[in-house]
């Protein structure tokens, strides 16, 4: 296999001290076991001179008064104000400390409720051992957790296969669909599979069943999908119209114009490089993030390139793509970059978190891999900060007054052919995706079994090896999507597109279907809890085992690097029975279920701080809301005011109290609501 494309975070758990599990009660009381529990046992790949520290909540006020709370990437502090901590860190030369999550006033109240404000990154001289400094800090009662800022590593240097005329010549036929005029839609079997793309191994219907779903909805620009991956090619002609735009930022600015802690974050942020410029042209960039983005929201019906699941219909924009870049050329992101990206996505409007990366499955063959986590507790207890960030997205993305309350995280299940999904995918709060081929069979590389919740088309290059030659062999059995021109070159008329495979390509199919469903709920003006949509996604999946031939082995050609050639291999489908999740994701069935569920949305009551303001977009509460104009009446203008600015209602708090108000659309539809103005700040100034 030459181009499998799910990112893995490699690490080796450090062994516990011999006999630690046999510690006596006396030793525990002396703090030996307690100190060990405070420090993550995983230090492999740790960045020198850096630690991630969570302080005890008892010293929160001390940190605030010392000004450390307001520290961030652009202004680290040099003292914590906690004497015992400062005494230790003064010994490690020139240390700096900053909050893991920069202050964003819009979300600070939630951050403090979740305890994320207690996490800090401490930097010190690289001459000192991170393990020794971690052990010293763990002895302090003021410190509740110490973790290492590990480097995230790509599991593979896989390469995409650019679309060429020679690849296209292998196609026996092209799927015909009147849906859109995008010229390569006929090659995207993963959306519309008529069973005739190749002479064999293509089964009609082995797709995401999106063609009928497009008649119901093609996406909505109010729905944002955050892509944690390599960067997205922001200049790609098939993607640029569906990129998320931070309207309060300035493109390529070095200033944090909107005060969210990140300068120049116009289409997202390059967390790996530490600036707002999203990049795709680095030496080790593979085009992975751009490929994922195209599956979700390449512009549909624009007469150009490919189609996507939720990319609009030509007259209406699709869902928006937020680039949260955690890999950038030769720069591999760290755990610090990853968790910042996750929280950033939640705070800036994303409701779907697309994650085509993870650790190695704990059930992976140790001859080929280094197995990692096998249980929920192993992963969660070893990666507390990572879990906290993901949990923040699950519970704080979206809005209780919006279409979706909470966020949905979709992970690739992994490519080790292991009988258990990798983590974090396998954790029950997330969607874990296995990959299938164009005939419904499990892809030869996919993880399956424990922790797997759903399947989706991910391609299967080795299985389609008889189609094509050399590097192009099997390409037509893979997923076709967008690629940066730095990957494909610019000379070919087919440049900007190509094939990849992996559970990391199955993953965005599920993320896109989720986003399409939320878009449809927006159209219907229905409200859902994220858990409700997640359950419906799984309940509406299509059973796939009925299409498997259990009487014979699935044959494929596996490229063996040591031998330099491909060898015939087999897999027994009986081993996969009941282990590919609830079935293959089904866009039409999912949207149909949404139509019959949920609660009708009404304009919410408004809460605004005294001398502050709250901004609400009314369009999601009204039929054809984006095309409407609005008027707002406030009964007591001494308490609050409202300015209508296009599709934004800006409420300002003038005096403490409550007042009745109403909002009316040009169509005549109206809602009554209450505005409450209150002092929302505590003694530290946080809302």
Predicted segments — roles?
Residues 24-27, 215, 219-221, 230, ...:
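Substrate-binding/access-modulating region of protease and related hydrolase catalytic domains
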Residues 29-169:
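Inhibitory N-terminal propeptides of secreted protease zymogens
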Residues 106-121, 135-224, 232-238, 242, ...:
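Protease zymogen maturation seam
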Residues 209, 228-235, 248-260, 274, ...:
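Flexible, small-residue-rich helix->loop connector segments that border functional cores
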Residues 283, 306, 334, 338, ...:
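Active-site-adjacent substrate-recognition loops and nearby beta-strands
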Residues 293-297, 322-327, 343, 351, ...:
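Hydrolase catalytic cores
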Residues 350-357, 406-407, 521-621, 642-644, ...:
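C-terminal subdomain of the subtilisin-like protease fold in secreted/lumenal serine endopeptidases
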Residues 595-687:
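Extracytoplasmic soluble-region selector
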